[in-house]
Regions:
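Short, charge-patterned binding micro-sites
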Residues: 3, 41-61
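Hydrophobic residues positioned within well-ordered beta-strands of beta-sheet architectures
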Residues: 4-8, 54, 86-88
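Short glycine-/aliphatic-rich beta-strand segments at the starts of folded cytosolic domains
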Residues: 4-13, 18
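Beta-strand elements of well-folded, non-transmembrane domains
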Residues: 10-14, 34, 60-62
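C-terminal binding/interaction regions
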Residues: 21
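Short arginine-rich
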Residues: 27-36
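A short linear hydrophobic-aromatic micro-motif
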Residues: 38-43, 86-87
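C-terminal structural segments of small proteins and small subunits
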Residues: 58-93
Length: 93
């Protein structure tokens, strides 16, 4: 069993309220949290309206599968979330 922790930090240019932030970042938990091998939560910058940090914990039988899943998560977020990814960290436990 292999475990990866994927942390993404976002900038939300022009975002003026926490309500707007929820609308722009909304759905990350619903989109990825339903996958049995992925857990997701907003892990930082919770009180700032112009930034956000989300952490994904991915488990799998091989490191290769987990790396592939991390890449898929990043690509899907780039296509679907109205925010700019500022930093990506991958850690294997």
């Amino acid at each position: 069993m292999h475990i990866a922790i994927l942390t993404l930090t976002f900038a939300l240019p022009g975002c003026s309220s926490l309500k707007e932030k929820r609308q722009r970042m909304g759905g990350l938990h619903a989109r990825f949290g339903n996958t049995p091998s992925v857990a997701v939560c907003e892990s930082g910058e919770r009180d700032r309206h112009d930034a956000s940090e989300w952490t994904f914990v991915i488990v799998g039988l091989s490191k290769r599968d987990i790396e592939s899943q991390c890449s898929q998560i990043e690509e899907k977020i780039e296509r679907t979330v109205d925010a700019r990814i500022m930093n990506v960290e991958r850690e294997f436990v």
